[in-house]
């Protein structure tokens, strides 16, 4: 059974920082690109960041709205992906999900700024 379990959400002041984590199981994590996606009533579903494989030198890509503020990383030995979020803004409020190539999704973690 595939599982993606996010954690680390909560309430943070504008300008603050927060780190989200996602632990995967049930598939070969190191073979999958990983993404963070967020959902809010105002913007709907919004892709945030992507990290590719070791063979791609763990290349990363970001939505323009978070570039320079958010950092995605992964630890294949722990089947985990992370999202470090700095200088948070009210518009960053939403439910954050980790996903593979959008085939598998976690249950989400709520971030409120």
Curated annotation (Swiss-Prot):
One of its GO terms (molecular function) is antigen binding. InterPro entries: Ig-like_dom, Ig-like_dom_sf, Ig-like_fold, Ig_sub, Ig_V-set, IgHV. Signal peptide: none annotated. GO terms for cellular component: extracellular region; immunoglobulin complex. Keywords: Adaptive immunity, Disulfide bond, Immunity, Immunoglobulin. PROSITE patterns: IG_LIKE. It comes from the Eukaryota. Disulfide bonds join 22-98. One of its GO terms (biological process) is immunoglobulin mediated immune response. PANTHER family: IMMUNOGLOBULIN HEAVY CHAIN. This chain was isolated from a myeloma protein that binds inulin. This is Ig heavy chain V-III region A4. It comes from Mus musculus (Mouse).
């Amino acid at each position: 059974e595939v599982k993606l379990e996010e954690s680390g959400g909560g309430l943070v002041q504008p300008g603050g920082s927060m780190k989200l984590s996602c632990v995967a199981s049930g598939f070969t994590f190191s073979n999958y690109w990983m993404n963070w996606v967020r959902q809010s009533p105002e913007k709907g579903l919004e892709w945030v960041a992507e990290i590719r494989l070791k063979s791609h030198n763990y290349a990363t890509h970001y939505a323009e709205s978070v570039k320079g503020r958010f950092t995605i990383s992964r630890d294949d030995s722990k089947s985990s992906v992370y999202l470090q979020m700095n200088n948070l803004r009210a518009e960053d409020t939403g439910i954050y999900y980790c996903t593979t190539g959008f085939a598998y999704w976690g249950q989400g973690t709520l971030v409120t700024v």
